[in-house]
């Protein structure tokens, strides 16, 4: 049989499925590494910027483009081909044979010949063959571009049967997950207008696949992303998200929208401000959908970090409770994104912080402060230190809920950088003015905690601890003005004077000045050498 004669799926008999399984495992490992890298930063002030930069540069990182391709395979094969069967123009048995066949790279020429024939069955066989070639571990994306396949795939998007449009879209989606030049070839060959047209298709799976290509293109580079913005595609995605109840389409639109935020420079606020409302609507519809929430929470985290105006919008939509509840989802990238949203709100005014407390955020922070992932613990400690720097009511709430004991446990067991944030929060608790609450933290052992912290080498935190110590001593003096200071007596009982003596000779001026002032105000000279 010549190569121009009919091909049958049985000729495509490689061990490709084993290769695809191996590729899925390789991609899973790479994704896991990307997630683990989240927890290896050393300085908290850098971690948010560093991690955000990593997220923003996904389009330039081929490893993460493979992750997008992985998502394509997992979701699309099982979900969309079933419903396409009702719209077929080719025999069902041929459709199934084509989709079940295996291919190998050595059949490249054979597949191209089949694709370019006029026979509809052979053409579909070749088209599926191209998609399967693209799904191989060593995907021949460039070779297919070099033989001119892209322009033919784009042509199929116009007025072709649904199964042809779907396969062509799928092929273009994988090509868009390649290098920047490969992705850009779709733009250069005029693919964008035809892809955008399919966003309006009445066939949901075509719409989903078109959305997917847009996400892969937007994540590639700011030039392609900005060309999509110019074509008002961001707004079109928002329109779809606002009008659909289909879960898969909501997931895909949210992911595609998130791609617009993952490339620097950040898009303008006046473009993206409507996204919050659409994401809020979707969060109500899919409150526990992990795939959707991963992208939705990333968008909200990014927006509250880079566009402070969106915090007000977020609060007005009243989805803070939904975001806080996501802290209970045991998925690292969802928890981190939600903690960043909470942290960005908590770093605002007192009313914003109070709203978080009213939505029971403290219940969740008690758990996330002891999460296995260091990054999550660090974010949680930072948020608590911000809340502890709030109003008297907010400090009292922390004390009422026994956060001194919670923070004390973290200080005792955690890494130094997390310990420092917790120390900051503990010291802030001493600024409470109500006698009832000062007595409570004294009873819970705050002097012991501060005593241990006075042995730290970090001058900044030493100064904070001395200030907190002064607050407690001032309370003791005020509570018994005519007699001995009960806090001084407790300090004496604990044997803290050796530490105080050493601090008199500290080389850092701010520590030296604060300790001298403390000793002069609250301790008799006889106690100090």
Language model features with spans:
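Alpha-helical solenoid repeats of the armadillo/HEAT superfamily
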Residues: 118-131, 160-176, 202-219, 230, ...
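Intrinsically disordered, low-complexity regulatory regions
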Residues: 1-119, 124, 128-132, 483-487, ...
């Amino acid at each position: 049989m010549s190569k121009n004669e009919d091909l049958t799926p049985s000729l495509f008999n490689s061990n490709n499925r084993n290769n695809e399984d191996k590729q899925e495992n390789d991609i899973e490992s790479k994704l896991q590494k990307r997630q683990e890298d989240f927890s290896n930063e050393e300085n908290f002030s850098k971690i948010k910027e560093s991690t955000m930069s990593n997220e923003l540069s996904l389009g330039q990182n081929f490893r993460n483009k493979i992750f997008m391709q992985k998502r394509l395979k997992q979701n699309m094969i099982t979900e969309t081909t079933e419903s396409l069967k009702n719209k077929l123009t080719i025999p069902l048995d041929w459709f199934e044979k084509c989709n079940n066949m295996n291919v190998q790279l050595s059949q490249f020429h054979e597949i191209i010949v089949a694709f370019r024939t006029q026979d509809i069955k052979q053409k579909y066989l070749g088209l599926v063959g191209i998609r399967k070639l693209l799904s191989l571990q060593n995907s021949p994306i460039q070779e297919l571009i070099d033989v001119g396949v892209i322009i033919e795939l784009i042509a199929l998007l116009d007025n072709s049967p649904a199964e042809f449009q779907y396969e062509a879209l799928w092929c273009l989606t994988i090509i868009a997950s390649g290098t920047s030049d490969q992705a850009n070839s779709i733009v250069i060959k005029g693919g964008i207008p035809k892809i955008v047209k399919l966003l309006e298709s009445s066939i949901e799976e075509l719409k989903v696949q078109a959305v997917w290509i847009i996400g892969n293109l937007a994540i590639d580079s700011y030039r392609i992303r900005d060309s999509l913005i110019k074509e008002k595609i961001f707004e079109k995605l928002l329109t779809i998200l606002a009008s659909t109840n289909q879960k898969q389409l909501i997931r895909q639109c949210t992911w595609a929208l998130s791609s617009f935020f993952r490339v620097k420079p950040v898009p303008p606020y006046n473009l993206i401000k409507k996204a919050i409302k659409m994401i809020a609507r979707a969060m109500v519809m899919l409150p526990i959908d992990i795939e959707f929430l991963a992208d939705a929470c990333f968008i909200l985290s990014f927006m509250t970090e880079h566009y402070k105006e969106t915090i007000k919008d977020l609060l007005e939509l009243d989805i803070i409770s939904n975001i806080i509840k996501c802290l209970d989802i045991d998925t690292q990238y969802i928890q981190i994104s939600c903690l960043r949203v909470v942290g960005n709100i908590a770093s605002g005014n007192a009313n914003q912080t109070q709203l978080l407390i009213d939505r029971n955020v403290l219940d969740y922070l008690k758990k996330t402060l002891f999460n296995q992932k260091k990054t999550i613990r660090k974010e949680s400690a930072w948020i608590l230190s911000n809340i502890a720097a709030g109003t008297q009511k907010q400090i009292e709430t922390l004390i009422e809920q026994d956060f001194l004991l919670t923070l004390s446990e973290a200080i005792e067991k955690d890494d130094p950088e997390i310990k420092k944030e917790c120390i900051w929060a503990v010291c802030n608790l001493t600024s409470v003015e109500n006698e009832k609450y000062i007595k409570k933290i004294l009873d819970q052992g705050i002097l012991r905690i501060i005593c241990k912290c006075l042995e730290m080498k970090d001058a900044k935190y030493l100064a904070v601890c001395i200030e907190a110590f002064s607050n407690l001593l001032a309370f003791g003096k005020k509570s018994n003005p005519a007699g001995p200071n009960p806090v001084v007596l407790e300090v004496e009982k604990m044997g803290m004077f050796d530490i105080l003596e050493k601090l008199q000779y500290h080389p850092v001026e701010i520590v030296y000045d604060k300790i001298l002032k403390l000793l002069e105000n609250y301790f008799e000279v006889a106690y100090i050498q």
